[in-house]
Amino acid sequence: MSKMAEEKAAAVGGLGGAGAADAAQQQQLAAGEAAAARVRPVETLLRAAPLGLCVAAMTVMLRNQQSNEYGAVAYSDLGGFKYLVYANGLCAAYSLVSAFYTAVPRPATVSRSWLVFLLDQVFTYLILAAGAAAAELLYLAYNGDKEVTWSEACGVFGSFCRQARTSVAITFGTVLCFILLSLISSYRLFSAYEAPPSSALGSKGVEIAAYPR
C-alpha cells in the first residue's frame, strides 16, 4: 500500500509541476507580447525607412547617364550598377511587405520569428553585396588599375561618377537599416530559447572528456 501511495503522490506532484511550468510559460509569452506591442511602432518605422532609401538610390542610378565628345555611358553598361538597381528594387518591396507585417498585431510564434529572421538575413546580405560591388566599380572608375592598364574614367565622365557615388552612399544607408533589423529579429528569435537548467549538467558540473594518448 505504501508503494502505491508513493506512486500516486509522485504522479500528483508531477502534474502540479507541469501545471506550474505551463503557467510560467504563459506568463512569459504574455510578457513577450506586451514588450512586442511597445516596440512595434518603432520597428514598423524602422522597416519602412529602407523603402524610401531604396527608391531614392534606385531612382538616382536609373537616371544616371552622360554623353560628351568622348562618348556616352549609362548605368546599364555596367553589371555592378544594374545589380544595385535590382537589389534596391527587391529590398524596397520587402521593406514594404515587412512593415505591413510588423504593423499588424499577431501572436508571436517561433516559426514566425524564424521566418522574419531568415528573410532579414537574406536581404541584408543582398543589399550589402550590391553596395560592395558598386563601390568597387566606383573605385576603379576613379583610380583605374595599372596592373591591367585600366585608366580612370571619372575625369571624363564626372557627372556620371558623382551620381553613382550618391546612389552607392544611399545604398549603404539602407545596409545600416537592414543590419539593425537583423539584430532586432535575431534578438527576438533567440530570446525565445531558454538556457538549459544547471541541474541538466549533473551534480558534478561539466565533465571534460579525456582522450587516450
From Swiss-Prot:
- Is this entry keyworded Cell membrane? yes
This protein's UniProt keywords = Cell membrane, Membrane, Transmembrane, Transmembrane helix
Q: What is this protein called?
A: CASP-like protein 2A1
**Cytoplasmic topological segments:** 1-41, 105-113, 188-213
Q: Could you give the subunit structure recorded for this chain? A: Homodimer and heterodimers.
Q: Where in the cell is it found?
A: Cell membrane
Give residue spans on the Extracellular membrane side.
Answer: 63-83, 135-166
Q: What is the lineage of its organism?
A: Eukaryota, Viridiplantae, Streptophyta, Embryophyta, Tracheophyta
- How does this protein sit in the membrane? Multi-pass membrane protein
Which GO cellular component term is one of those annotated?
A: plasma membrane
Cited InterPro entries:
CASP/CASPL, CASP_dom
**Superkingdom to which the source organism belongs:** Eukaryota
Q: Which residues cross the membrane?
A: 42-62, 84-104, 114-134, 167-187
By sequence similarity, the record places it as follows:
Belongs to the Casparian strip membrane proteins (CASP) family.
